Amino acid sequence: MAVALIFATRARIKILFFDMIFSLEKDPFDLFSKWYKAVLNSPCEQPTAMTLATCSKDCIPSARVVLLKEYSKEGFVFFTNVNSKKGKELTENPKAALVFHWIEFARQVRIEGEVKLLNDERTDKYFSSRALGSQISAWCSKQSSILKDWQDFEQAIKLKEKEFHNTQVSRPDFWVGFCVIPKVIEFWQEGEYRKHIRFRYTLVEGSDWKVEQLYP
């Protein structure tokens, strides 16, 4: 909270408020990149954290915080166990929403779109870059299923460490990457007295985006 108090001062919010108005990009990815780089270059505690909302085939929503691992004009990438709750829901209903909330900058980005699986090559590349402990844990975690005894998990990790001793850890087939391909991206900047600035980008055709300002 100390960092938030330093950065989210009224004076700073005013500067960011007018910066958004006068430096609006035609392409939402360019604006996201600008905002994201500013966050990465600041003492923000969790710059890559984003809320991921999914929905089951029965239209029951769920949400959780995951970490952004890659982004480009193709979309926003994260990795997970395909057998987890979110993995199953994205397989059944490949649509999702994301929310970035950077409280230090009094900014929020909302994203809605379709979801696709990354190919094995890209997923393998990222998996190989992970810490050894994280690779082993990925093998041993039956994500979202009931764990009756923590020692069972610890024991599975020890066995897997022996199995992969002095060898490269391969990626389990159930560990996958998803890419959220945006149809809508909304940027929100806090303003004084709740006079917030909101701009919504909607994909209309090909790579063309329609930009609309919304009431706060």
UniProtKB/Swiss-Prot annotation:
SUPFAM superfamilies for the chain: FMN-binding split barrel
GO biological process entries: pyridoxine biosynthetic process
Binding site for substrate: K69, Y126, R130, S134, R194, K195, H196
Catalytic activity: pyridoxamine 5'-phosphate + O2 + H2O = pyridoxal 5'-phosphate + H2O2 + NH4(+); pyridoxine 5'-phosphate + O2 = pyridoxal 5'-phosphate + H2O2
Known EC number: 1.4.3.5
Keyword Membrane carried by entry: no
Essential cofactor(s): FMN
Annotated positions binding FMN: 64-69, 79-80, 85-86, 108, 143-144, 188, 198
Co-factor remark: Binds 1 FMN per subunit.
UniProt keyword Cell wall biogenesis/degradation, yes or no: no
Origin superkingdom: Bacteria
Cross-referenced InterPro entries: Pyridox_Oxase (IPR000659), Pyridox_Oxase_CS (IPR019740), Pyridox_Oxase_N (IPR011576), Pyridoxamine_oxidase_dimer_C (IPR019576), Split_barrel_FMN-bd (IPR012349)
Gene Ontology MF terms: FMN binding; pyridoxamine phosphate oxidase activity
Pathway: Cofactor metabolism; pyridoxal 5'-phosphate salvage; pyridoxal 5'-phosphate from pyridoxamine 5'-phosphate: step 1/1; Cofactor metabolism; pyridoxal 5'-phosphate salvage; pyridoxal 5'-phosphate from pyridoxine 5'-phosphate: step 1/1
Keywords: Flavoprotein, FMN, Oxidoreductase, Pyridoxine biosynthesis
One Pfam family cited in the UniProt record for this chain: PNPOx_N
Entry's family note: Belongs to the pyridoxamine 5'-phosphate oxidase family.
NCBIfam families: pdxH, PRK05679.1
Stated role: Catalyzes the oxidation of either pyridoxine 5'-phosphate (PNP) or pyridoxamine 5'-phosphate (PMP) into pyridoxal 5'-phosphate (PLP).
UniProt cross-references to HAMAP family, sorted A to Z: PdxH
Assembly notes: Homodimer.
Descriptive protein name: Pyridoxine/pyridoxamine 5'-phosphate oxidase
Gene: pdxH
